[in-house]
Amino acid sequence: ALQGELLHLAAHDALDEAGIGRGQQHLLRKDIRGDAIHWLDRESEAQRHYLDAMAELQRSLNQALFLGLFEYEAHFAHYPAGAFYQRHLDSFRGRANRVISTVGYLTPDWPADGGGEMVIYDPDNPSREVARVVPEAGTFACFLSETIPHEVLPTRLPRTSIAGWFRRNASLGGVLDPAR
C-alpha cells in the first residue's frame, strides 16, 4: 500500500524536490541529492500503520537504551533512474536533534544490477565501506544519525523508500529545535 501511494504521488507530480540543509540554509542541489519527497502525515491507513509501528519501535528503543526519543518524522523518497545522494550525515555534529535514522525500502523485486544501494561507512575511517544495503522491499535499516556516514549510489531504476528520524528535543540558544 505504501509503495502504491508513493507511486501515485509521483505520477501526479505531488512530490517535492528534496534539498539539503534546514531553514534559511535549505538549498536544492541536484549535484548532491536527486530524490523527490513527501512527508508522512497519517493521511492514509498505510501511513498510520507505518507510523504506529515506528512509535512502537521508539518506545522499545527508549525503554532498552534510555535515548529520550520524543518524536519521529519521515518522508517518502522517490529516486528516479540516475538519482543519488552523496555521502552525508543525517544530523549536524553536536546538534543531537536527529538521533536514529531509519530507511524502509518499498520497491519489490529489486534486480541485482539495479544500483541505488545505501552504502554505510566507518565513522572512524570514512573511506572504509562497512555495509551495502540493497533497496529491496521489506528491508529496514536503522543507524545513528549523527555519526554514521552513508550515501545512496546512483540508481538505474526508480527506487522508493521511507526515510525517517527519531528525534530528541534539542534546545538551540534557548529555542526548541522543531521537526523538519
Predicted region positions:
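Fe(II)/2-oxoglutarate oxygenase catalytic core
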Residues: 1-101, 105-140, 146-180
